[in-house]
Structures are given as C-alpha cells and as structure tokens.
Amino acid sequence: MSNNSNKRAPTTATQRLKQDYLRIKKDPVPYICAEPLPSNILEWHYVVRGPEMTPYEGGYYHGKLIFPREFPFKPPSIYMITPNGRFKCNTRLCLSITDFHPDTWNPAWSVSTILTGLLSFMVEKGPTLGSIETSDFTKKQLAAQSLVFNLKDKVFCELFPEVVEEIKQKQKAQDELSNRPQNLPLPDVVPDGELHRGQHGIQLLNGHAPAAGPNLAGLPQANRHHGLLGGALANLFVIVGFAAFAYTVKYVLRSIAQE
C-alpha cells in the first residue's frame, strides 16, 4: 500500500474536516488561523497571535493538530512548535480536548472549538502534562523572538503567506524605529530681549549665547560691578533727599520765628 493511501482519510473524517475548514474561513477564531496540509487533511497547522494584555502579545505561535482517522469520534493530538514559555515544543499536550482525554471528548466539537480551548488554556497558568513554568519576562522575550523563528520554518511560510507578510512588515517597522536618529535637544528660545540662563549657567539673549571671546568669562564680574554701582547711587540719592528735606524744614521754622 502506498504512502498516499495510508494518508487518505476516511470519508467521514474528510467530510467533517472540510466542513470545519469552511466554518473557520467564514467565522474565524479570534487570534488564530489554521490550514490543513494540502497532502494530508488529517494534519492541520495553526498560528496563534499573542493576545493583547498578555505576556504573549506581539508573538506568533505555530503548532499543529493531528486528527485520527476516526475523527470526529476520537479527539486529535495537539503540538506547539514555536518556543513560547507555556508549552513544551513538539510534545503532545494534555488538554481536555486532546487524545489524552478521550472519555471527555465530544464529537460535536469542531476545529474552532479545539483551537479556542487551546488559546484559553495557553493564557492561563494551570499546570498540565506538556506545560512548563517560565516568568512573564521570558515569555515576552520568546514572543519577540518568535518572528524570526517562524520565518525559518518552511511549512509555516508555505501555509501562512499572509502571516509571513505581516511579520515582515512588523520587522521592517521595528528596524526603521531602531535606526531612526535620536532627537537633538532644541535650543533655548525666549521672547526677544529677554535674558535667561541656559546650560552651564550662561545667560542667553533671545535664546542665543553671546559670542565666544574674552568678555564671556568676565560676564559675572561685570554684572557684580554694575550691581555695586547701582547700590551706591541709590544710597547717595537718599542722603541728598534727606538733606534737602531738613533744609526746607529749617527754613520754614526760621520764617515763622521772624514773624
């Protein structure tokens, strides 16, 4: 018997999986897309986009479903291929919707139901056979690394060209952001005629420092001299004013005495 005949699924499984495929295309599962192998409808591959507000945000997680020839009367096995920090890679996962628990399997469950259950368990932290424990930091690192990892997978690229393009666009945006020159500090600009201090305590006029030269170093000393001169003049004006007032009073008193 040839390999192709070994891979040929029974009519019941084929019909059911075709129906499930049409259902997924019409009503996609949130965050997940799935495609069967063109050569074997019993092997499906899926991609989970990491949901927002989770450690998996920004990541792309590739895995596969292996359906038995008795599907839908027996459950499939589920594998995760992309390193993710939640499940072991290329290991059968023990979930209530997999072949680890045929006693809890419901033939009415579709491929959409299976993938929804997988995503639900992925964002939880409950342990199971095939799961691992890692920190959120590690999961975020793996999410960032998943882009490059998946682009190296031939099956991934063949089955999910739209996702591949999405990843490449995201990588391009990240590269442009990282290569963008840092913004230079803006000059200190103030209204015309106003002085304020810029960096290193240098006074700026209209947002510009005075031209470099011998006078620049003497600015603080010159300002100090101007302050002393102004204070002396103010004291002199007070003394002169007081003397004038005293002379006026004396003159008035003398005039009254003569009368």
UniProtKB/Swiss-Prot annotation:
One of its GO terms (biological process) is ERAD pathway. The keyword Nucleotide-binding applies. Residues 1-226 are cytoplasmic. GO terms for cellular component: endoplasmic reticulum; endoplasmic reticulum membrane; ubiquitin ligase complex. Keywords: ATP-binding, Endoplasmic reticulum, Membrane, Nucleotide-binding, Transferase, Transmembrane, Transmembrane helix, Ubl conjugation pathway, Unfolded protein response. It catalyses: S-ubiquitinyl-[E1 ubiquitin-activating enzyme]-L-cysteine + [E2 ubiquitin-conjugating enzyme]-L-cysteine = [E1 ubiquitin-activating enzyme]-L-cysteine + S-ubiquitinyl-[E2 ubiquitin-conjugating enzyme]-L-cysteine. It comes from the Eukaryota. It holds the Pfam family UQ_con. The chain crosses the membrane at residues 227-247. It is a single-pass type IV membrane protein. Its EC number is 2.3.2.23. Residues 248-259 are lumenal. SUPFAM superfamilies: UBC-like (SSF54495). The active site is at residue 94. Residues 12-162 form the UBC core domain. Catalyzes the covalent attachment of ubiquitin to other proteins. Seems to function in the selective degradation of misfolded membrane proteins from the endoplasmic reticulum (ERAD). In cooperation with the GATOR2 complex, catalyzes 'Lys-6'-linked ubiquitination of NPRL2. Belongs to the ubiquitin-conjugating enzyme family. This is Ubiquitin-conjugating enzyme E2 J2. It comes from Mus musculus (Mouse).
